[in-house]
Amino acid sequence: MDSTIRPVTTDDVAELQKISRETFKVTFDPFTAPDDMAHFLDEDYATNVLISEIENPNSRFFFLLVGDKIAGYLKVNVGDAQKEHLKENALELQRIYLRSNFQHKGLGNVLFDYAEKIARDEKKDYMWLGVYEKNINAQHFYKRHGFKRVGQHVFQVGDDLQIDWLLLKKL
């Protein structure tokens, strides 16, 4: 499937908000109470929050396009934008999401490969991420890409304290 990747700018905030809310909800609705989900989506994907993240020089967002449709997106962090500091000289893969109708077509690999290329081009020694302990499909995806579990942390969704596994890959 032909695709292109392009950086997200503040002009794209409405589309970023739309795909962020949609893909997070689809992915985590089965595990999350409705009130907790609504609170998380309203807080973490608020327009001002997303603009601040886009403008942060240590965070970068990218859209994956199939034709003229936004199929998915990616967010990577370095430096103080990272949620944890597992290793020096690391890149955090904070978000990698595809819309449901674009899953299982190899596009997750396209986004992942793009993130890894960024890390390698910037001479990072490691990539890391957090993955929900109940998100088995994502765990298998990251294992296939060479990640190993090295710890865990709490990820708060509304009032729900969920456990994310911390995964690390040496580059």
Enumerate the predicted regions with their spans.
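Extreme N-terminal starter segment of soluble prokaryotic enzymes
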Residues: 2-4
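Acetyl-CoA-dependent GNAT
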Residues: 7-13, 17-30, 38-101, 112-114, ...
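C-terminal "cap" of GNAT-fold acetyltransferases
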Residues: 87-91, 125-139, 143-145, 152-171
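Short acidic-aromatic loop segments in the C-terminal HATPase_c
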Residues: 97, 147-148
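Active-site acidic-Proline motif in GNAT/NAT acetyltransferases
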Residues: 99-101, 105, 133-134
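Conserved acetyl-CoA-binding loop-helix of GNAT-fold acetyltransferases
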Residues: 104-117, 140-144
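Short coil/turn segments at alpha/beta junctions that flank glycine-rich nucleotide-binding fingerprints
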Residues: 105, 122-125
